[in-house]
Structures are given as C-alpha cells and as structure tokens.
Amino acid sequence: MSLLTEVETYVLSIVPSGPLKAEIAQRLEDVFAGKNTDLEALMEWLKTRPILSPLTKGILGFVFTLTVPSERGLQRRRFVQNALNGNGDPNNMDRAVKLYRKLKREITFHGAKEVALSYSAGALASCMGLIYNRMGAVTTEVAFAVVCATCEQIADSQHRSHRQMVTTTNPLIRHENRMVLASTTAKAMEQMAGSSEQAAEAMEVASQARQMVQAMRAIGTPPSSSAGLKDDLLENLQAYQKRMGVQMQRFK
C-alpha cells in the first residue's frame, strides 16, 4: 500500500458515512493526484462543511496543507489550529512536545507511526498542531505517520465498545482500505484500457466499481460489506489482462 493510499484510508475511516464522505474522498484523491492545487479554496470549503467534528476538520486541513504545494508564508488557518490544540489540556501539550522531539529523529513513516501509537489521540492532535505551526521541522512522511496514528486511535475508540478482533487492524480501517484499493484498481483498469477493442468492457467494469464505492460511502455500510470488493475487481482486471496478453503484476 502506497503512503498516500494509507493516509487516505486512515483519514476516511474517521469521517461519518454520507454524501459528504464520498465528496471528501474525491477531494483527497484529487489533492494526492496533484489535480487540486488551490489550497485557499480547499480550506474555505472544508471550514464550512457541516457534520464534521472540529478535530476531523483539523486533521483534513492538516493533510491538505501538507500535500498541496503552497507559498512558504501562507497564513495558518485558525480553525485548524484550534482543533489541534489538544483540547487546551496542558498534559496533552507536554506529551506532544516530547513526541515532537522524538519524531524529529525519525525519518521513516512506519518508524514514526510506531512511536506515535503509544500516545493518546489528544497528545497526537497537539503534536499535529506543533507540526502545523512549524511545518517543515519533520519530514512529510513523519507528519503523515502522526495523521494515521491519530486516526487509528480515534477509529479504535469509536469501535471499542463492540470490538472483538483477532488482528490489531480496526475493521473500520480495513473497510475503508478495501474501498480505497478498489478505487485504485479501477483507475488502473481505466489506464490500461486505452483504445483497445476490450476498452469499453474494462471502462464499464471500472466505472461500476467506482460508483459502488461512492454509493457505499454515501449511504454508509457495515465493515463486512466491502469484503471481496477489491478481489472481485482484481479478478476482472486479471481476466482482461489475459485477453490482452499483458501482465500488470504491480496492480495486485
């Protein structure tokens, strides 16, 4: 799973199901693909979204700011700063400062995420606030690791009351990851289609998959509903590859 796919998965796992979730997923995809580079417009759009909690808005604002190329002197947004202040709890801030110092020594995403997961969501949010206000003091990978760790803590707390898990991965995150990977596979099919004779068939399968993922996000579905979604799509992709006489192992 690529870094941006992982970030998209974790961030979407804390967004409530509904039409807005599908819209946010599309914005994230566009931002990560470099198709949306107007940070000011993005932040203004995010600030006025209903339903989302201040913390979720803060996390999304942090991700947008981290990803979209912007002027060095760009003004920080108050709604992001307020959301990432650890609820004003001095204990959260103390822990955030300690974590921030540790993160400055980390260079890999997974190393930083492992360190971050030992802290509470409040301390992690405060740490994000420190990084947001001094953007550039840690690497982008490390900053994304803090985002994913925070979302994992939030998703865990949301799910803990009825969680009976064999693995440590949260079902909400697994569910979101299946949908993100299905979208990615659909994109791969569209790119492969080109102008071949079977292009219409490939485009149709990919289009149906994308519509299904959008619908699942918009109406809200239980975590088990996405099981097999990516696998079904990959089977279609592999059958298409076979007919075309090509092998695209990297999409597996």
UniProtKB/Swiss-Prot annotation:
<dbReference type="GO" id="GO:0039660">
    <property type="term" value="F:structural constituent of virion"/>
</dbReference>
<comment type="subunit">
    <text>Homodimer and homomultimer. Interacts with NEP. Binds ribonucleocapsid by both interacting with genomic RNA and NP protein. May interact with HA and NA. Cannot bind NP without genomic RNA.</text>
</comment>
<dbReference type="GO" id="GO:0016020">
    <property type="term" value="C:membrane"/>
</dbReference>
<keyword id="KW-0472">Membrane</keyword>
<dbReference type="InterPro" id="IPR036039">
    <property type="entry name" value="Flu_matrix_M1"/>
</dbReference>
<dbReference type="GO" id="GO:0055036">
    <property type="term" value="C:virion membrane"/>
</dbReference>
<dbReference type="InterPro" id="IPR015799">
    <property type="entry name" value="Flu_matrix_M1_N_sub2"/>
</dbReference>
<feature type="region of interest" description="Membrane-binding">
    <location>
        <begin position="1"/>
        <end position="164"/>
    </location>
</feature>
<keyword id="KW-1048">Host nucleus</keyword>
<comment type="similarity">
    <text>Belongs to the influenza viruses Matrix protein M1 family.</text>
</comment>
<feature type="region of interest" description="RNP-binding">
    <location>
        <begin position="165"/>
        <end position="252"/>
    </location>
</feature>
<comment type="function">
    <text>Plays critical roles in virus replication, from virus entry and uncoating to assembly and budding of the virus particle. M1 binding to ribonucleocapsids (RNPs) in nucleus seems to inhibit viral transcription. Interaction of viral NEP with M1-RNP is thought to promote nuclear export of the complex, which is targeted to the virion assembly site at the apical plasma membrane in polarized epithelial cells. Interactions with NA and HA may bring M1, a non-raft-associated protein, into lipid rafts. Forms a continuous shell on the inner side of the lipid bilayer in virion, where it binds the RNP.</text>
</comment>
<dbReference type="GO" id="GO:0042025">
    <property type="term" value="C:host cell nucleus"/>
</dbReference>
<dbReference type="InterPro" id="IPR015423">
    <property type="entry name" value="Flu_matrix_M1_N_sub1"/>
</dbReference>
<keyword id="KW-0946">Virion</keyword>
<dbReference type="GO" id="GO:0046761">
    <property type="term" value="P:viral budding from plasma membrane"/>
</dbReference>
<dbReference type="InterPro" id="IPR013188">
    <property type="entry name" value="Flu_matrix_M1_C"/>
</dbReference>
<dbReference type="GO" id="GO:0003723">
    <property type="term" value="F:RNA binding"/>
</dbReference>
<dbReference type="Pfam" id="PF08289">
    <property type="entry name" value="Flu_M1_C"/>
</dbReference>
<keyword id="KW-0694">RNA-binding</keyword>
<feature type="short sequence motif" description="Nuclear localization signal">
    <location>
        <begin position="101"/>
        <end position="105"/>
    </location>
</feature>
<protein>
    <recommendedName>
        <fullName>Matrix protein 1</fullName>
    </recommendedName>
</protein>
<dbReference type="Pfam" id="PF00598">
    <property type="entry name" value="Flu_M1"/>
</dbReference>
<dbReference type="InterPro" id="IPR037533">
    <property type="entry name" value="INFV_M1"/>
</dbReference>
<comment type="function">
    <text>Determines the virion's shape: spherical or filamentous. Clinical isolates of influenza are characterized by the presence of significant proportion of filamentous virions, whereas after multiple passage on eggs or cell culture, virions have only spherical morphology. Filamentous virions are thought to be important to infect neighboring cells, and spherical virions more suited to spread through aerosol between hosts organisms.</text>
</comment>
<dbReference type="InterPro" id="IPR001561">
    <property type="entry name" value="Flu_matrix_M1_N"/>
</dbReference>
<keyword id="KW-0468">Viral matrix protein</keyword>
